[in-house]
């Protein structure tokens, strides 16, 4: 983990074959989105504690259907059961809600993320039109509706 030019990064060693060849950008070797999706689903299935993985999956629902995400997982990990990620996406008890989350220009609400993950499981072939996030109030591009969440709801679920 670290930053390059103010962008947070994770450096990983991965022993599975890539679904698509990595590409170079700004001198960095980057995995293809299909590989990243498969690895995120594996992390959720195996551990399920990283809040960011769940947020990333909800955000990726604007580019990929859950069905296509699961096909990436099956291709990358052919001997794994696809039910693990499906169940993992809906099991929230192990998530570390103390993890700091920074999404430029957006505020996240766990309730919106959880709702999107549930919607993804119910509409597995659907690609969603909008991200499950609200724009920061300072951003001018889009008017944000009144926000009635408490600070505790913004940074984790109610206990």
Predicted regions and their residues:
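Compositionally biased terminal segments of proteins
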Residues: 1-158
């Amino acid at each position: 983990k670290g930053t390059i030019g103010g962008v947070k990064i994770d450096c990983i060693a991965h022993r599975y074959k890539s679904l698509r060849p990595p590409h170079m950008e700004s001198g960095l070797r980057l995995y293809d989105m299909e590989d990243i999706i498969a690895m995120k689903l594996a992390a959720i299935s195996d551990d399920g504690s990283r809040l960011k993985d769940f947020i990333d999956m909800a955000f990726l629902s604007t580019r990929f259907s859950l069905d296509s995400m699961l096909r990436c997982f099956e291709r990358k990990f052919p001997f794994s059961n696809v039910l693990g990620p499906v169940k993992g996406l809906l099991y929230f008890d192990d998530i570390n809600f103390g993890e700091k989350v920074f999404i430029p220009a957006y505020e996240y609400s766990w309730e919106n993320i959880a709702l999107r993950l549930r919607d993804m499981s119910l509409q597995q072939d659907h690609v969603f039109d909008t991200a499950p996030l609200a724009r920061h109030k300072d951003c001018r591009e889009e008017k944000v509706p009144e926000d009635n969440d408490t600070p505790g709801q913004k940074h984790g679920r109610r206990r």
